[in-house]
């Protein structure tokens, strides 16, 4: 009787025990299958990349891939990046080089290290500018302490630290500021009286520019205008003259790291859409509306000077011919 009770649990557990063992066998088979798939997924050694049946070496820094290798372990056909325009700074499998960064002077930046085929441009803040962020795409003017003492001078990575004024200095400034305000108003009124168009200024107003000057070819002045504008000024000018937003985005996409090229392309796009007739006058008026009167007056002065020189040269030639 005792042996029947001992054997009965084993008989009842038999099917369940068999199922568990079969399940365990299936798990082991699945693991083996995964291991086999993993081994066939990557047949190349570290540092190589697979192209069909071949494991190819990468291109070296300063190069881009032109054609994959044709033998396992072989090197692809690689061409050098354009010096001063493109770079790659590590081994890679790409068919493109990276575009060199542009240090925008309008944002207070200057070149620290020129771009090479193996190294990107390194920018830094110009003198009297600073940036205290880890990645800087815009530098700020250093603070001037004025009559205060300087505790720490401005560096390229930190702003000036000034010593706080005493109450006596504050009282002095309260006495000086009204006088400075009066002086500013006086100078401003004098300046307004000598705006272009005033006979004493020697510079005609945009409305009084003769037709032959108004229709001057602006191509030689486009880059000078762009050089003095910030990228935000150029975009504002383009939008004021109905340049489509899609065209502005296209220009930015074509030269993503080159703000100088973007400014030139924006102005050239406007010039092409406007046409030569009246373009000089439209450019000067547009710059004034964009609150860049300084650029407008400088461009107008250059155009007027070139016009006067052209007239003078023509007179000299005519006089020389009459003497002959």
Curated annotation (Swiss-Prot):
Q: Which Gene Ontology cellular-component terms appear in the entry?
A: apical dendrite; apical plasma membrane; CD95 death-inducing signaling complex; cell surface; death-inducing signaling complex; external side of plasma membrane; extracellular region; extracellular space
Matching entries from SMART domains are given as: DEATH (SM00005), TNFR (SM00208)
On the tree of life, the source organism's domain of life is Eukaryota
Q: Which InterPro entries match?
A: DEATH-like_dom_sf, Death_dom, Fas_rcpt, TNFR/NGFR_Cys_rich_reg, TNFRSF6_death, TNFRSF6_N
Q: Which UniProt keywords apply?
A: Apoptosis, Calmodulin-binding, Cell membrane, Disulfide bond, Glycoprotein, Lipoprotein, Membrane, Palmitate, Phosphoprotein, Receptor, Repeat, Signal, Transmembrane, Transmembrane helix
What GO terms describe the biological role, i.e. biological process, of this protein? activation-induced cell death of T cells; apoptotic process; apoptotic signaling pathway; B cell mediated immunity; cellular response to amino acid starvation; cellular response to cobalt ion; cellular response to cytokine stimulus; cellular response to estrogen stimulus
Q: Where in the cell is it found?
A: Cell membrane; Membrane raft
- Kindly list the cysteine pairs connected by disulfide bridges: 44-55, 56-69, 59-78, 81-97, 100-115, 103-123, 125-139, 142-154, 145-162
Physiological role? Receptor for TNFSF6/FASLG. The adapter molecule FADD recruits caspase CASP8 to the activated receptor. The resulting death-inducing signaling complex (DISC) performs CASP8 proteolytic activation which initiates the subsequent cascade of caspases (aspartate-specific cysteine proteases) mediating apoptosis. FAS-mediated apoptosis may have a role in the induction of peripheral tolerance, in the antigen-stimulated suicide of mature T-cells, or both.
Entry protein name: Tumor necrosis factor receptor superfamily member 6
Q: Per the UniProt entry, what species is this protein from, by scientific name? A: Rattus norvegicus
